[in-house]
A protein has these predicted regions:
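Short, polar/acidic, helix-capping and beta-turn segments at strand->helix junctions
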Residues: 2-11, 15, 20-152
Length: 152
């Protein structure tokens, strides 16, 4: 008795199914927020936007954000610049870096045609976890209402 071999359906890879059903766009933003190396600042696949990591470096100026002096004066006052040297030197770097990174995220998200309320997840890296409350204070200025999920 001869048996007929089973026909297995052709396996579809994630790449092949995504490319058939979802439009994919790669973006490098305007100079004020362009990446430091050759990579996409974000990638849009269907309704999803995936951002590359953003650090506290201003590529346009070639400047590492180190304190209140490296961000607009209005932003520095808004996030907690006191004018008191010892206090500003202690908390200024993390507040200014947090503001700069979140502003770059906002610019990138808006460049992609979305808004901060569309952000569903953030991943933050800290050298010193004691800085998280200061970062969180700045983050609350950029996100209102439902907060994105977060990994620290």
């Amino acid at each position: 008795m001869a048996t007929t071999p089973l026909k297995t359906p052709k396996r579809q890879t994630a790449k092949s199914s995504a490319s058939k059903s979802l439009a994919s766009k790669t973006h490098t933003p305007k100079p004020q927020a362009s990446p430091l190396a050759r990579y996409s600042a974000y990638r849009q696949v269907g309704d999803f936007i995936f951002l590359s990591g953003i650090i506290a470096v201003n590529p346009k100026e070639g400047l590492i954000i180190q304190g209140f002096a490296d961000i607009p004066q209005e932003a520095a006052r808004l996030i907690g610049q006191t004018g008191e040297f010892s206090s500003d030197m202690k908390i200024g770097p993390i507040l200014a870096q947090s503001w700069f990174v979140l502003e770059q995220i906002q610019k990138t998200v808006e460049d992609a045609g979305a808004q901060m309320s569309d952000v569903v997840k953030l991943v933050q890296y800290f050298k010193n976890l004691d800085h998280f409350p200061l970062y969180s204070r700045v983050r609350n200025l950029f996100f209102t209402g439902v907060m994105p999920t977060s990994t620290v």
